[in-house]
Amino acid sequence: MLEFAISAPLDTGAELLSDQVSANFPWLSLSILFPIVGAFLVPFIPDEGEGKQVRWFALGIALVTFLITVAAYLYGYDPSLSGLQLSERVSWLPDLGLTWAVGADGISMPLILLTSFITALAVLAAWPVTFKPKLFFFLILAMDGGQIAVFAVQDMLLFFLAWELELLPVYLLLAIWGGKKRQYAATKFIIYTAGSSLFILLVALAMGFFGGGTPNFEYTNLAQQSFGTGFQLLCYAGLLIAFGVKLPIVPLHTWLPDAHGEATAPVHMLLAGILLKMGGYALMRFNAQLLPEAHAQFAPLLIVLGVVNIIYAALTSFAQRNLKRKIAYSSISHMGFVLIGIGSFSALGTSGAMLQMISHGLIGASLFFLVGATYDRTHTLQLEEMGGVGQKMRIMFALWTVCALASLALPGMSGFVSELMVFVGFATDEAYTLTFRIVIAGLAAIGVILTPIYLLSMLREIFFGKENDQLVSHTNLVDAEPREVYIISCLLVPIIGIGLYPRLMTDSYTASIQELVKRDDLALQRIKKPSALMIRNTTMTPAVVSSPRLPITQTRSEQLTRK
């Protein structure tokens, strides 16, 4: 008994010490810098020119990066806390107010994991690349670090630099390895994304220099600033344009079908799985979190734009005869649910938007990978030129069917849960009038009805449509290879897992989403003249007026120190 009484406190102390070390370890900086450093080592890898050695090296770097992000989640992240965790802060250029500040909360941590996971699979999907393989894998690894940085940095000026970092690799991946119109698609991509990102820089400078003195661009500082309503509205409008291009929001979407139409399978996976999520994440992080009063007034517009995305993109996808462009417009349609969820003032609806980003990242990556695999066999993207290949590619047909069912939100798949959460969250959101909720829900349901029609008809045309004799007779239609089955299986495991037990993912961000919604609810109640047609009038209470800003939640390290 004496031995037990002595050893128990020692074990507890050792456990706390271990937790403290894990929380203070620079997990996020390592996950950002490791793939970037690995990218710069690629030119020194001995290779015979076909990329056989380079691709193994790149796969190893991508897998280690994924394991680093998993370790960060397991050993340094506490899902029950809503505040910033895994914090690292180094004063970089103090005169300019630029700080290397990284951290993660429930809004960013799931997307960091998604980024490293999709990138590792994209490297495996790039196995057949033999044209300039060193440059190709260099760009993929550089994108890995840059995209993780977008979700992890906690300084707005540093965020802008990370946002710009991933533009050049995508441009080169499109311009060098794309299809016949690759130069047009790459140029259009860089004009849209680089041009719109200037708004991020302008808003960052305006918010950082707000109030005079030494500029400070850190999120924690900006969240405590008392920005005027007019200032918030201007900043919100600029950021909505910048992030709306990346999401993308109609009519700022036209670069995406062109980019997808010319990209290769691994680039497809990065575009659909990660790049679009950067726009949704940024809307949550900046527009909803840092500019709550402006968000309360812009929220109805986000919901209307979300419905436009859903219906317009679904109808356009229905009319597309090019397989890549059909799936591209389908992606735009599904991202409309993210806008509706972000515009919702309910925790369920906003949580659904977060889950929809994760779900669509997985489903979109799987569909576009299958598009690339199918093109490698048929050498055509026109649906009327396909048909009758189902008998020779039965495994491929099975993979296509499962992924298409996930995209059309079949119960038991992640897409069903996320869209249902958005629908129910918005329908029960009493911040909006009943008429507005009924109209929006009814219109959004049109997209839900159209999705299975164009996806299932697409499958019928590809595999069981009118046979193309030249394709069936003279083309070596090889069925799915083990590598391809493995990639799709890796994506289907979380898709089905989240669909059957959503708490596998929702528990990781619920606390942060609830804090975000609470902040926006308080901002909504401070608005004096809400729109009578869309937003219900709210009564201002003394408790709300006396608390203009929410307190910063203690970090993981502070909690451990208190223990």
Swiss-Prot record:
Catalytically driven reaction(s): a plastoquinone + NADH + (n+1) H(+)(in) = a plastoquinol + NAD(+) + n H(+)(out); a plastoquinone + NADPH + (n+1) H(+)(in) = a plastoquinol + NADP(+) + n H(+)(out)
Signal peptide: none
Listed GO MF terms: NADH dehydrogenase (ubiquinone) activity; ubiquinone binding
Cellular localization per UniProt: Cellular thylakoid membrane
A Gene Ontology biological process term: electron transport coupled proton transport
GO cellular component: plasma membrane-derived thylakoid membrane
Class of enzymatic activity (EC top level): translocase
Keyword Protein biosynthesis (UniProt): no
Pfam family, one: Proton_antipo_M
E.C. number(s) listed in UniProt: 7.1.1.-
Keywords per UniProt: Membrane, NAD, NADP, Plastoquinone, Quinone, Thylakoid, Translocase, Transmembrane, Transmembrane helix
NCBIfam families associated with the record: NDH_I_M, PRK02546.1, PRK12561.1
Role of this protein: NDH-1 shuttles electrons from NAD(P)H, via FMN and iron-sulfur (Fe-S) centers, to quinones in the respiratory chain. The immediate electron acceptor for the enzyme in this species is believed to be plastoquinone. Couples the redox reaction to proton translocation (for every two electrons transferred, four hydrogen ions are translocated across the cytoplasmic membrane), and thus conserves the redox energy in a proton gradient.
Family: Belongs to the complex I subunit 4 family.
Protein name: NAD(P)H-quinone oxidoreductase chain 4
Biological source species: Prochlorococcus marinus (strain MIT 9313)
